[in-house]
Amino acid sequence: MQASAPVSSKKHKQQEDRVKRDDSLGTSPNIPSAACRTALLQLLQSALWGRAPQEQAFQGLTRADWQSIFLTAQAQTVMALAFQAFEFLPDELLPDDALLTRWMVQTEQAEQHSRHMNDALASLCEFFTTRGLQPVVLKGQSIARLYRHPLARECGDIDLHFSIHGQAAQALCALRDAGVHPQPKPDGSYLYSWQDVPVEHHPRFTDLASPFARRRLSGMLSRFPSQSVALGMGTHAQIMVPEPTVSLFIQSTHILKHAMGWGIGLRQMADLAVSLHSEHSRIDGRSYKRVCSQAHILQWNGLLHGFLTQCLGLPLQQLPYADRLFDSQPLQERVWRDGNFGLLHTTRIASQSSWRSKCRTAVSMLRHARFGWTYAPAETLFTALQLMAGQFSTGALHTDDHNE
């Protein structure tokens, strides 16, 4: 369905202006320059859509600029994806040979890691299916297969959900019988390693904090059943993935959770853009809008869709429904300042204690409360209630995800 041109109501324009004042890009030393941000976005658009980038974005870039672009792409986990755009750039606009070689080597390493991830995923799915179980692969490789260069989509862990009643418990029993011992988390999920790849079993397929919205959406999987698809990427595996409308909802709420917390990165934005581009003809836009309305995230979608069209070049007609798009600047600030799950944030320390991590997560969410109230007030309310109750590790609050 053709989307309307970007427009914002007066009320939300005022709200956006307040968010912009609170989230100034100039307050963090980690933010790349405007020229570097523009160049990286041009590389991503080129890699995503298979077209030449705008050459003027790369004219005049210094060696230091290219180094900043490379490091930012690393932190945003889009380094290998951005590398795919160099085939469209003339030699005189490419980075210097030393950096280009480093970029190429690390891209090859990322692609090799993706191959290992695919082998592990294929093996794990076979382990479960031979026992009569049907794991659904959430995010990650279920989306990587949609990319023009699937192996260039940098991966982290395997996320699974068992939607058939009783199968989640059966899966844990099967793993224990095989000598694998999943570790429980406070939100009801389980973590373990399979062929040196971290795996997480999720009790729910959404990241919604509101219990009322979760109840209203409990029948979503039955209305939109998961489907079997070819994993591809050099494998012969078949995997179960969410139906495209469900996948879209999962991604939108997942990005929202992290945008309200430590931060979100360009890779998750690219995932959503690729999903819409590849499967827009199969997405039930009317049903998707109704589900998002029930979850009270239509305003959030307006901001998110604005980012996809304004920053990643997604065509308006590939949005799931005609949308009132907001200026994406507030979301851009969250992406550029904090990066992929907050990896750019100077106060985030990987080795911090569990208690300290929870406190920092709470502080981070409180820092961005105005952002949440502007675009997803219901989710922000229930997130705040959980914080007040001290449940820092619930499904909606837990932000120490692996890199998916």
Protein language model regions, located:
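Conserved NTP-donor binding/palm subdomain of two-metal-ion nucleotidyltransferases/polymerases, i.e.
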Residues: 2, 7-16, 20-156, 162-404
